[in-house]
């Protein structure tokens, strides 16, 4: 329901804004800043995830679980490289009891995904290998975003 979705998004704003900040520094909570759809906010990372889920569900391509490496562009490679850093950020956050590392990482992934998404009309591309690459990256982004959100105590949404 809409009420439930609003509650989840409100929780996202509060939780993410609290966890994005290093505990060793002071910060002032600013509702307007932390509820903005752009920037390091919970709404921004939720929006990136919803965008990815929507794209993935609209696709009619039968996804092959392999990359066509000659068809990866710079934005694809940046996101793939960042996705491969998951264990580093997770261990750093866990070992130091500093959840802001995971929150920062979630923002980094969301930002890179949005950059890839905006650079190419993925579903309109006539090259099925490029489309497959981008959808495969999208599927990994979705999986990692959900895992990161749940690790931070944030419930992912399907629609906004």
What name fits each language-model region?
Residues 1, 5-160:
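Non-catalytic interaction-recognition regions
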């Amino acid at each position: 329901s809409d009420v439930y979705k609003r509650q989840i998004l409100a929780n996202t704003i509060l939780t993410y804004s609290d966890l994005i900040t290093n505990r060793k520094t002071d910060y002032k909570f600013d509702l307007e800043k932390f509820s903005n759809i752009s920037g390091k906010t919970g709404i921004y990372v939720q929006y990136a995830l919803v965008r990815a889920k929507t794209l993935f569900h609209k696709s009619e391509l039968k996804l092959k679980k392999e990359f066509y490496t000659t068809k990866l562009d710079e934005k694809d490679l940046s996101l793939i490289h960042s996705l491969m850093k998951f264990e580093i950020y997770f261990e750093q956050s866990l070992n130091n009891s500093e959840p802001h590392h995971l929150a920062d990482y979630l923002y980094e992934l969301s930002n890179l995904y949005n950059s890839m998404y905006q650079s190419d009309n993925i579903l309109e591309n006539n090259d099925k290998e490029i489309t497959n690459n981008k959808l495969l990256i999208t599927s990994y982004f979705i999986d990692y975003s959900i895992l990161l959100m749940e690790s931070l105590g944030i419930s992912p949404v399907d629609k906004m």
